[in-house]
Amino acid sequence: MKHFEANFDGLVGPTHNYAGLSFGNVASLNNAAATSSPKDAAKQGIKKAKALADLGLVQGMFAPQERPDLHTLRRIGFTGSDAEVLNKAAKEAPALLRACCSASSMWTANAATVSPSADTHDGKLHFTPANLVDKLHRSIEPVTTGNILQATFNDSRYFKHHQHLPEHTSFGDEGAANHTRLCSEYGHAGIELFVYGQEATNPSAPKPQKFPARQTLEASQAIARLHQLDDDNTVYMQQNPDVIDQGVFHNDVIAVGNQNVLFYHEQAFLNTQAKLEEIKRKFGESPLHFVEVPTAKVAIQDAVKSYLFNTQVVTLPSGEMAIIAPTNCQENPAVHAYLNELVTLGSPIKQVHYFDVKQSMQNGGGPACLRLRVAMNQDEVAAVNQNTMMNDALFARLNQWVDKHYRDRLSVADLADPQLVIESRTALDELTQIMKLGSVYQFQR
């Protein structure tokens, strides 16, 4: 049977804006209050997803969340019509309004953690939406994320869906951005790497001092239990607290893995050598490639600014691996020089493809943030909601949909415009029909 690693990218929502909501994310903070282009952002994401499909990869799309989130604004005491709720929130609590208008669900690397059927006791593909409790604007996502996942992977013979973890910082969970999987082949049992920032129940354990550690060891262990993983195919690694304090808010900003390659910065982890030995031991005899980028070649600051590690490492139908990088990597001399060298180093990575995702990058999310990886066999791929899979027809339909519903420009002040609610709901209602999702949104229920 054939096996694939599919990428599911998040469609950028109609309220894409730069509100600087993500403390610890340097790009997000640096671009706060800039004017965004929801239309450009959505089209950049759709174009990137189509390009990967054209490379021969299995590519799907996730719908965005309903924003502005009037349900949450009402839950915290704002009353009246939709227009009155927005007006009151804009006057009395503008920061809360901004949080309820974020299009951050486009970064589907944070949507969930996924364990393929080759790794799990029951032989099913497991999904757990991330609770994202560290950031208010993301903590309101998990219920709708679960609805969208279930509408996309809706065959219970193959797919097992879990509720997100308890909404407490002890179980802070940021999804696949802190999880990667190493394997000899996508269909073989692999090693699932869970990377955490701190131990919630051990105050004396190392943790960052300046920026928050968003993922806890306790959350990672809970996911592994839910997904029915063995100790023999799980490794827990702590991210270096010093790099978190330098703006590496998720592990996918400093490391990325694919099949038998782990591509990471020299400073990415604590106890690196011991953990690499554990991975080798559990991985077995098959070839395994650790590609370590030394600080002398790429400083942490350059890695964060360019998002060198927030690239996608993908296996092409030819068997060669390619890096899908943002154009920012081309524009950074040290990073560009390193990538040119990387393809000559003898690892399976032989190609680099550059994509313009600047609207996402300015809010702190590169190519890897925009996708959730799902390793599947051909029966599982066939069981996915096919209306979510990228092809020529969906590409054309989504571009037409964006042209019809999205604004060219959006400022933070525009978030209080009642017309934006109507535009957004009209767009999402039509999208659920295009992608055959059913009633996944609060306003449809």
From Swiss-Prot:
Q: Name one GO biological process term.
A: arginine catabolic process to succinate
Q: Which UniProt keywords apply?
A: Arginine metabolism, Hydrolase
Subunit organization = Homodimer.
Q: What is this protein called?
A: N-succinylarginine dihydrolase
Function, in words: Catalyzes the hydrolysis of N(2)-succinylarginine into N(2)-succinylornithine, ammonia and CO(2).
Location of the active site: 174, 250, 369 (nucleophile)
Q: In which pathway does it act?
A: Amino-acid degradation; L-arginine degradation via AST pathway; L-glutamate and succinate from L-arginine: step 2/5
The EC code for this enzyme is 3.5.3.23
Q: Which reactions fall under this protein's catalytic activity?
A: N(2)-succinyl-L-arginine + 2 H2O + 2 H(+) = N(2)-succinyl-L-ornithine + 2 NH4(+) + CO2
> What family is it from?
Belongs to the succinylarginine dihydrolase family.
Binding residues for substrate: 19-28, 110, 137-138, 214, 252, 363
**Catalytic EC class:** hydrolase
Q: Quote one Gene Ontology molecular function term.
A: N-succinylarginine dihydrolase activity
What would be one Pfam family of this protein? Answer: AstB
Annotated PANTHER family: N-SUCCINYLARGININE DIHYDROLASE (PTHR30420:SF2)
Gene name linked to the record? astB
